[in-house]
Amino acid sequence: MLFRSYQKSVLKIGQPRLIDIRTRKTKYIFFIGPTGVGKTTTIAKIASTLRLTKQTKVALITSDTYRIAAVDQLKTYANILGIPLQVVYSPQDMKPAMEELSEYDLVFVDTAGRSHNNKEQKEDIQNLLDTVEDANKEVFLVLSATTKYKDLVKIAQTYSEITKYNLIFTKLDETETVGSLYNIHMLTGAPLSYATWGQNVPDDIGKIDAQSMAKKLLGGNS
């Protein structure tokens, strides 16, 4: 019976939806989500991994000009990796930034943390996403595994009204449970992708493994 439950859980979780690096045109990878979940650090982890291990030509764009030192943080990562960074202050700035980075395979777009309760801020995210055609972009909603489940539900549902997305969960090192990850995945139908468990760049990140999660859900060791 336990094995059957394990099999069902694995099938429901499915395979992680990772960034597709097989692209002929520049692809834009947007990272959206509330404040304080680790979007910028997650971008640095993924960008550095692809840059160093896959030799992917990557670049960065940030629209997070609201948070103190946010641009400087991403600029530091860009300098270390030797990759370009464009700063945009409005959706209108995206076109010239995209023209500057048209020779790159992947462009990671860091967005400002937004309140899911603020209509104007939701529209800001929508307008930014609309600057890139669906065929040329992927969107990742970054959530913290430590956030209360009730709040996760509200956040995920609100962003579902804006766009389709894949799920990234951060701060797994700060919690013992993974039930909220599974439940949000089932609630939204959004594919799971990456998980992070620390601040080290480019380490402490990996794909969400269905077998490991199923074992944890059933009370076993991962």
Where are these regions (language model features)?
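C-terminal-of-GTPase-core extension/linker across diverse P-loop GTPases
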Residues: 3-33, 37, 90, 100-105, ...
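Conserved nucleotide-sensing/catalytic segment adjacent to the nucleotide-binding pocket
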Residues: 78-113
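Short acidic loop-to-helix transition motifs that present clustered carboxylates
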Residues: 66-68, 90-94, 148
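Conserved catalytic network of the ASCE P-loop NTPase/AAA+ motor domain
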Residues: 23, 51-54, 78-81, 99-104, ...
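Primarily NTPase-proximal linker/entry elements flanking Walker-type ATP/GTP-binding cores
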Residues: 1-58, 62-65, 76-77, 81-83, ...
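Inter-motif core of Ras-like GTPase G domains
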Residues: 56-59, 99-108, 121-146
